[in-house]
Amino acid sequence: MSHGPKQPGAAAAPAGGKAPGQHGGFVVTVKQERGEGPRAGEKGSHEEEPVKKRGWPKGKKRKKILPNGPKAPVTGYVRFLNERREQIRTRHPDLPFPEITKMLGAEWSKLQPTEKQRYLDEAEREKQQYMKELRAYQQSEAYKMCTEKIQEKKIKKEDSSSGLMNTLLNGHKGGDCDGFSTFDVPIFTEEFLDQNKAREAELRRLRKMNVAFEEQNAVLQRHTQSMSSARERLEQELALEERRTLALQQQLQAVRQALTASFASLPVPGTGETPTLGTLDFYMARLHGAIERDPAQHEKLIVRIKEILAQVASEHL
C-alpha cells in the first residue's frame, strides 16, 4: 500500500506516540501553565483569554452582601473627600488619584474644628438612619431569604471544589463555578480605600484622645487622693479641737460653780450682794470696784478672796 506525501502543515508526533490532541497534549498544556509559559511564536487556546489580575476591575461595583439592604453610611472624612474630590479634579485634571487624596488629607488636617464637626454630624445622622433601616430590614422576609441563599452558596462551594479545579484546567470560565461569583471578594475601589483610610485616621485620633484622657484621669486621681488625704487630716484636727473645746467648757463651768459657791459667803461691801451662776461676772466686777476704792479698809476681805482663789485653782486648774 502506498502512502501519500505528508501534508506541509502536519506536525511530528511527540515521543510516546500520542497526538497533540490526546491526553499527552493536555499534560503539555498544564506544564506550560505551571512553568514559564509558551515559547515565542507558540499560541495556545489559553492565550485567547487574558490572565486575571488580583483585585477587582476598576470601576466595577462591589457585589452587595445583602441585596436590597440599606446602603452603609460613610464617615465624616469620606463625606469631605467625596465633596471636594471633583472640585480638585476640575482644577487639576492631570493630577493622579493618590496626589488628590494626599492633598485632601492635608486639607482635612488643617480644617477648622467647626467645619470638621459639620461633616461628622452629618455622618452621625446618616449612621443613625442606617442603623434604623438595617434593623427594619433584618426583620423583613427578603433578609431571611438572602441569608438562606448565602448559606446554600457556601454549602454548594464546598461540594463543587473538584468541578472548579477541572474548569480551571480546561482553560475556560465556568458560569456557576467561578470563584469570584461564589465568594464575596473584598475590592479596592476608590470609595473602599477612602473609607479604610478614614477609619484608620479616626482610630489614630481616638487612640490619641484615649491616651490624653488617661493622662488627665491619672492627674485627677492624684488630685482626688491628695484632697481626700487633706480632708481626712482636717476632719481629725476638727474632731480634736471639738474635744478640747468641750473639755474647756466643762472646766469653765466647774470653775464658775466653785467660785459661786465659795463667794456666796462674801457679800459686796455696801450692797450685800451675793453671786449666782447668772450674775457671777457682775458680782466679781462690783467686788473688785469696792476693794479698789478703799483697799486698806478691806484688807481682811482681800486675804479671804486670795484664799478662795487659791483653793479653786488647786482643785479645778
Swiss-Prot record:
Annotated region described as Disordered, given as residue ranges: 1-71
Record's signal peptide: none
Coiled coil regions, renumbered to chain: 190-257
Extent of Basic and acidic residues compositional bias: 31-52
UniProt cross-link Glycyl lysine isopeptide (Lys-Gly) (interchain with G-Cter in SUMO2), position: K31
Keywords: Cell cycle, Chromatin regulator, Chromosome, Coiled coil, DNA-binding, Isopeptide bond, Nucleus, Phosphoprotein, Transcription, Transcription regulation, Ubl conjugation
BP GO annotations: chromatin organization; negative regulation of protein sumoylation; positive regulation of neuron differentiation; protein sumoylation; regulation of gene expression; skeletal muscle cell differentiation
Molecular-function annotations in GO: DNA binding
CDD domains: HMG-box_HMG20B
Compositionally biased spans, kind Low complexity: 1-17
Residues bearing PTM Phosphoserine: S160
One Pfam match: HMG_box
Listed InterPro entries: ChromReg_NeuronalGeneExpr (IPR051965), HMG_box_dom (IPR009071), HMG_box_dom_sf (IPR036910)
Disulfide linkage: none
DNA-binding positions: 70-138
Biased composition range(s): Basic residues: 53-65
Expressing tissues: Ubiquitously expressed in adult tissues.
GO cellular component, one term: chromosome
Subunit structure, as described in the record: Component of a BHC histone deacetylase complex that contains HDAC1, HDAC2, HMG20B/BRAF35, KDM1A, RCOR1/CoREST and PHF21A/BHC80. The BHC complex may also contain ZMYM2, ZNF217, ZMYM3, GSE1 and GTF2I. Interacts with the BRCA2 tumor suppressor protein. Interacts with DTNB.
Function summary: Required for correct progression through G2 phase of the cell cycle and entry into mitosis. Required for RCOR1/CoREST mediated repression of neuronal specific gene promoters.
Protein name: SWI/SNF-related matrix-associated actin-dependent regulator of chromatin subfamily E member 1-related
